[in-house]
Amino acid sequence: MTEITAEGNASITTTVIDNKNGSVPKSPGKVLKRTVTEDIVTTFSSPAAWLLVIALIITWSAVAIVMFDLVDYKNFSASSIAKIGSDPLKLVNDAVEETTDWIYGFFSLLSDIISSDGDEDDEDADEDIDKGEIEEPPLKRKEIQKEKAEKQEKPEKKIQTKVSHREKEKGKEKLKGEKPEKKATHKEKLEKKERTETKMAAKEDKKIKTKEKTEEKAKKEMKVGKQEKAKPAAAKAKETPKTTPKAREKDDKETPAVPKHEQKDQYAFCRYMIDMFVHGDLKPGQSPAVPPPSLTASRPALSTPSLEEKEKEEKKKVEKKVTSDTKKKEKGEAKKKSEKETVIDGKGKEPGKPPETKQTTTKLTTQAAATKDEKKEDSKKMKKPPEEKPKGKKQEKKEKHIEPAKTPKKEHPAPSEKHRKAKAEQAKEEIAPASTKKALHGKKEEKAKTVEQGKDVKPKLPQPQLKKEEKSEPQPKKEVKLETQLKKEEKSEPQVKKEAKLASSEKGQTRKQNITRPEQVIPHGKPEQKVPKQIKAITAEKTEKAERQEKYHPSIKTEGKPEVTDSGKKKIEKPEKESKVPPKQENLQVRNVTRAEKRGKISKDSKDAPAPKKDKDSKDVLHSKKDKEVTNNVSSPKKQKSPISFFQCVYLDGYNGYGFQFPVTPVQHSGENPGKSNSPGQKQQEQ
């Protein structure tokens, strides 16, 4: 009995080992299904589930309370009461419908949840059944099937070993035949791909070419439009009407229609929203505001009438130019004739030297009235054709600017005239200011005449000669004042003897002034009103020099240093720039330089030598140093760059309240009265 049990146990062990899955065989039994009720019971058996339910009830009740607080109870209750009073049946029906809807929705939700749970349970049960069928076949069937499969594999291996070499060769040939076929098919595929690629490339090339053509056309049309816009200066009347409208129409056609739609799409909604919020007129269903029609369509229509108007205007302009040119020529010839006559009269009237003026003064008074009438007529003629002669005026201005640069070289008077002018200036120094003004007018007139003599030497330039002598016509006003000048010169002769000591110190000054005076031509562009201001400054300077050099030699030491620094700044002009700067400025600049330098030199001499020797020593030193200063002024290229303006020159000597206040104003001396000042108005009262 013991042997049988041992054998039986061995057989059982072999079955377990032979089983490849390693799983113990199960007894065939059905899996139990869990129902929804069982799930609910299992969940709610624990206290945690009940806590969750209570928390949910509390939160949703709080939400309901908040919502009811937000509701307006008065209106709600009043409306409900009114409805109940009017038609209670409707109210009841509405309430029933609402409640049924709520209840139906709630039950549908519950049914969905329950049905989903039931479906999941059914699927789990089916899977369990399938697994049981797969796992529970008898062991014997598996073993038999495995044995049969192994027996079938062994004879197949033996048959394969007996295959002859011929079959192997045939197989190899078959493989070789298959390989070239594969290669051929591969080549065909490559060819097809290449063909498709070439077709695509050709299509792309065509597209690119068409794009390039369209771009070139557009560029050409743009260039044509630009050229036609640039041409109207040369040929406006002919070419513009032909080309510009076409170019504009083409450009309008070329501009694609897409941007217009895009603009509508972009801005239509914006307009709609703005109208909604700002105006409040539009309703949500209303169509948005239509954007205004584009102006591109109306452009060619507008361009044609404008071009016709341009043509008409151009024709009128051409006709006006022709008529204006003919009128200019006629008036220019008439003017030349009248100016030649005035030149001949001027040559006869011009006195050569200042002593001859005494004889001509009586004649000048009678001629003054006649020249005034001529001036009025000339001014009327000049006022009538101002618009028709813009070019003639420009030429006159150019020639005026050119001439004063050339004339000063020939305008230096003879040395005999210098001495006479020096004596005349010494005589004028203590004459009343009213007489000095008139005298200076007379002198300027003489200088202007000498300038005219220099200009008459050049007969080759007819136009500038005539134009300058037109401006020399206002001389008779100055000539009338010569009478008063000559009378006052006779009175001033006894005073010359008293001031003989001053003559030596002022000769150097007068010589330098005489060198620059021929350049003191009346500037062409400036009016005659500025002349009296300059005259006041000149007379004030002369009287101050005379008084200071007589009385206050020791006080000059204090003034020497600051004015020398200022004079260094004013050594700016070169002879090249003297032609450009107006001669009034040149006079005053030279005068300021000599004045400041003279004071500095006198102060140096006063330290070394006693007062009576100053005049003799200062003469020689001044003459030698003034020559050096002239050369220094010529060789100073950097100082050219900042010429002093006209108003600076006029107000250098003192601050009148009109211009800037400069440091050149002379300091009051301790010996002088505090009431005295440098303004020419007060000096008139003192004298």
Curated annotation (Swiss-Prot):
The chain crosses the membrane at residues 48-68. One of its GO terms (cellular component) is calcium channel complex. Glycans are attached at residue 514. Residues 295-306, 631-643, 667-687 have a biased composition (Polar residues). Residues 117-130 have a biased composition (Acidic residues). Phosphorylated by CaMK2. N-glycosylated. The keyword Endoplasmic reticulum applies. Residues 1-47 are cytoplasmic. Its main location: membrane. Detected in skeletal muscle (at protein level). Detected in skeletal muscle. The keyword Phosphoprotein applies. Residues 357-370 have a biased composition (Low complexity). One of its GO terms (biological process) is response to Aroclor 1254. PANTHER family: TRIADIN. Homooligomer of variable subunit number; disulfide-linked. Interacts with CASQ1 in skeletal muscle. Interacts with CASQ2. Interacts with RYR1 in skeletal muscle. This is Triadin. It comes from Rattus norvegicus.
